[in-house]
Amino acid sequence: MSLEARFKHTTRSSRWMVMFARLMSAGLFGAVAFGLSPRLELESRILLGFDVAMLTYIGSLVWRMAAADAVSTRDESGKIEFSNWIVLLLAGFLSGLSLLAVGLMLHRSRSWSPLMTNFHLGLSLAAVFLTWGLVHIVFGIHYARMYYDPTPPAGEPADRPPLEFPDDLMPDFWDFMYFAFTLAICYQVSDISIRGRQLRRVVLAHVLLSFLNVTLILGFVVEIVGTFISPTN
């Protein structure tokens, strides 16, 4: 095995190990939250565990990004992130999972007291917005990996990064979070230029997924609020 192939194999293995550790930690905290709420209904316990797991996973990512400067971002981005297709599948899965989790709540909402209604409303909205945030954090990390990838896609110059930032400083994770969340909210970024063909395709998928996600979220939020605060409750 060549040195380059061995390096790629090691990097790929470390990605799976890091992701497995994060998922296990998030799942453990979610399971603890589920287990410590035996008096709640099953749907409520599932959604509470889901929220805690999502918050734990996001916290682990933010904690790592907060301690990373530009050099650390370059070195670490390839160790915690995967290919385009895995990112898209993960983002779509997370979006659907949050909506499914909220759907568990809707068919039982009219049997709750006002206090429990407010509690479940908070759980439902937290699930939606935590998942929305995680989807775009995942895309931001993916943009960092594509930017610092030492082997660019075929046909693209190796000496020109796929993103052009307005200053001459090396971008860190927060620069890529800015890019990802601005795309998610505004569908465009005025001060960062996209110069890579492969990255344009990822951005297109990101924007389309974001639009679909926001459309579904708005529909679910209206349904949740309308169901939970209905005068017939």
What is the predicted function of each stretch?
Residues R15-S37:
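The first (N-terminal) embedded transmembrane alpha-helix
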Residues M24-F29, V87-L104, Y178-T182, I217:
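Hydrophobic alpha-helical transmembrane segments of multi-pass integral membrane proteins
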Residues E41-G59:
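Loop-to-helix transition at the N-terminal end of transmembrane alpha-helices
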Residues T73-F93:
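Juxtamembrane helix-capping/reentrant segments at transmembrane boundaries
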Residues L94-L115, F181-R197:
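Alpha-helical transmembrane segments and their membrane-interface junctions
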Residues F129-A154:
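Transmembrane alpha-helix/helix-exit interface in multi-pass inner-membrane proteins
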Residues Y147-D149, P153-S193:
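Membrane-proximal soluble regions of multi-pass membrane proteins
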Residues D175, F179-T182, S190-P231:
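Pore domain of cation channels
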